[in-house]
């Protein structure tokens, strides 16, 4: 507040501070005519009207000023010469502007003879009522004054509603029974020593905070008790009025403290909140400093549990936020939507660890549809991670005469695509899909070296699953058609493949030791082979996989520990030592008892392994019409190879391979 006193002149802010503090007795004298006084005046002001008769009697000393004060006061006033006296009229600014024969000049002269401190209110009642309408009372509800500050209300009629159960007002409001009943106020918190308790308020609904508006009062010890009293009124569905003399400093301090504690606001936020509701509030600096201490006290009480509850609330709001997975190396990594390809070591590690089918978790329902919809071309082009090798992948040439529409990834390839460091991590990620029928119709990983081709197109005869099941019980008796893989599943599953050898056949692929491209026969081909009674000759009859699959598994290659599962396409382009970008694990030797493969004896002369075109049967010609030529311009080495090594061995790694896929059109 701006405190200013010039001679016998006092400003309105200083007068309000004196009235709020209560430390000094202030005698207010209204020198206006009685009609104006009766209309509106400052609280507790005494009217000494400026009639000509009263002026003459004062000038002739026919009446004492003290007697005139007692006569004009509504109740007995203790006259003390040491108390301050403030006189005001309608709009006088200072004593110098007054004429010598006016009533106000005569009144001030007589008061100075009886009291030590006499002051004239600058601006008079007009200025005071404009700045502090809440401290004015009278019969009229509105004070006809000029408004120069739009931020302040014209008149504060009644208490101010801060919250639904909290009102802030002055002494005039609490003494107005009708106004209190209209607002439903049944509790009163009186923050003063002098303001009386209303008669219509019971003692149990009344609380007095005996503090004065001064710079030495302690209001902090009363704040918690005041907050509890307001909460008591709220619990009883009642409204409480917090008031002092003017509703500016003491009562505003208590209201701000309540907002701070119950609405979890800082001092600045609570002050602005109350200021917007009641612009006339102005706690003194002493109370503001104690509110700062109260803010620290609240933070100390709720500091331990506050941040925890907020973090917990934040976590409950985001339950679907992806949680980063921690790999074996201790680094955090999130599962991407388009998983990158891992190195060949991961594929080999996944290929050497057999897992029991019962221990394989289920595949997420989103993943099979994502994999089935992806074409083989995207699978081959997405084998590389680094952006600088994209131009190398563009050199990869492939041409298919068959319309291969989709490909199913194996668990080892999917594990490398998703960036899993081991096969255990991949098996925990992939779980059985609920969309497939049966327990043995899911994409699983197994070290069993049984390969089969699933034709991407539906069979011409539209065979059902019951036909291949008969093939498993009644197999062809012909010796050539019995050249099948005998699969033996080991329960321990820990045997390591010490020697790897390819399946030799005529052609340029035979000369390459590191990679073998193996394809079997589809279910329809096996059925036609049995019904025709023909034995396939040449390398086509090396592998006849006695497996079957439901139509839902058409156009996909699977593999598992049982004979009803297959290798996926990644087994063909997956993890050999030299061509890790394309090939997978090779066939084991016959010496390995765990992975035994029965195949025909390789002829000594490679030229005799294939006959001329006119010597072949029409059945074989029909199979050989459908061929797939795969030409690889340049093989891409594994990711851990440096570019220098790639330049050295680039000429040796390029090869041209032809492979034939047998299919019944």
Curated annotation (Swiss-Prot):
GO terms for cellular component: cytoplasm; cytoplasmic vesicle; cytosol; nucleoplasm; nucleus. It comes from the Eukaryota. It is an enzyme of class 3 (hydrolase). Residues 22-137 form the Rhodanese domain. PANTHER family: DUAL SPECIFICITY PROTEIN PHOSPHATASE (PTHR10159), DUAL SPECIFICITY PROTEIN PHOSPHATASE 16 (PTHR10159:SF343). Belongs to the protein-tyrosine phosphatase family. Non-receptor class dual specificity subfamily. This is Dual specificity protein phosphatase 16.
């Amino acid at each position: 507040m701006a405190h200013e006193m010039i001679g016998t002149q006092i400003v309105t802010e200083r007068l309000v501070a004196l009235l709020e503090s209560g430390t000094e007795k202030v005698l207010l004298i209204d020198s206006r005519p009685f009609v104006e006084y009766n209309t509106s005046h400052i609280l507790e002001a005494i009217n000494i009207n400026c009639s000509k008769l009263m002026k003459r009697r004062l000038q002739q000393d026919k009446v004492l000023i003290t007697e005139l004060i007692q006569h004009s006061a509504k109740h007995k006033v203790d006259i003390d010469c040491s108390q301050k006296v403030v006189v005001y009229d309608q709009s006088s600014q200072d004593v110098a502007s007054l004429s010598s024969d006016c009533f106000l000049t005569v009144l001030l002269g007589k008061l100075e003879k009886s009291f030590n401190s006499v002051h004239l209110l600058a601006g008079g009642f007009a200025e005071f009522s404009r700045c502090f309408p809440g401290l004015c009372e009278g019969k009229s509800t509105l004070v006809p004054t000029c408004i120069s500050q739009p931020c302040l209300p014209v008149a504060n009629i009644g208490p101010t509603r801060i919250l639904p159960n909290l009102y802030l007002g002055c002494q005039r409001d609490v003494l107005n029974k009708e106004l209190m009943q209209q607002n439903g106020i049944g509790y009163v918190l009186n923050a003063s020593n002098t303001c009386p308790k209303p008669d219509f308020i019971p003692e149990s609904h009344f609380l007095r905070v005996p503090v004065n508006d001064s710079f030495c009062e302690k209001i902090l010890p009363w704040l918690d008790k005041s907050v509890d009293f307001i909460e008591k009124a709220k619990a009883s569905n009642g409204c409480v009025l917090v008031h002092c003399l003017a509703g500016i400093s003491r009562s505003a301090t208590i209201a701000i403290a309540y907002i701070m504690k119950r609405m979890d606001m800082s001092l600045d936020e609570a002050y602005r909140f109350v200021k917007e509701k009641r612009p006339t509030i102005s706690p003194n600096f002493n109370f503001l400093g104690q509110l700062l201490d109260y803010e620290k006290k609240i933070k100390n009480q709720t500091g331990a549990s506050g941040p925890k509850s907020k973090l917990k609330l934040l976590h409950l709001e985001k339950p679907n936020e992806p949680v980063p997975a921690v790999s074996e190396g201790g680094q955090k990594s999130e599962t991407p939507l388009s998983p990158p390809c891992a190195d060949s070591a991961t594929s080999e590690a996944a290929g050497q660890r057999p897992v029991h089918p019962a221990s394989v978790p289920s595949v997420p329902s989103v993943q099979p549809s994502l994999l089935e919809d992806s074409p083989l071309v995207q699978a081959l082009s997405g084998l590389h991670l680094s952006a600088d090798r994209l131009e190398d992948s563009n050199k990869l040439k492939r041409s298919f005469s068959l319309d291969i529409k989709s490909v199913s990834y194996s668990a080892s390839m999917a594990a490398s695509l998703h960036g899993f460091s081991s096969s255990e991590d991949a098996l925990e990620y992939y779980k059985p899909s609920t969309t497939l029928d049966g327990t043995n119709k899911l994409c699983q990983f197994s070290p069993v070296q049984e390969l089969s081709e699933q034709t991407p197109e539906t069979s011409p005869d539209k065979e059902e699953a019951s036909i291949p099941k008969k093939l498993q019980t009644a197999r062809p008796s012909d010796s050539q058609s019995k050249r099948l893989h005998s699969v033996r599943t080991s329960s321990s599953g820990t045997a390591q493949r010490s020697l790897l050898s390819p399946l030799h056949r005529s052609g340029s692929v035979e000369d390459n030791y590191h990679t073998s491209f193996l394809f079997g026969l589809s279910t329809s081909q096996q059925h036609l082979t049995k019904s025709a009674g023909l034995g396939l000759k040449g390398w086509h009859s090396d592998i006849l996989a006695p497996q079957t699959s439901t139509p839902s598994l058409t156009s996909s290659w699977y593999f598992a520990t049982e004979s009803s599962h297959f290798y996926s396409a990644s087994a063909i382009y997956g993890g050999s030592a030299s061509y890790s970008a394309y090939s997978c694990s090779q066939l084991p030797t016959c010496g390995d008892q765990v992975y035994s493969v029965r195949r025909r004896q390789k002829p000594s002369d490679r030229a005799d392994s294939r006959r001329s075109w006119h010597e072949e049967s029409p059945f074989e010609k029909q199979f050989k019409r459908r061929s797939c030529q795969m030409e690889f311009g340049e093989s891409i080495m594994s990711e851990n190879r440096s570019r220098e090594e790639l330049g050295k061995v680039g000429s040796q790694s390029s090869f041209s391979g032809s492979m034939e896929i047998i299919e019944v059109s």
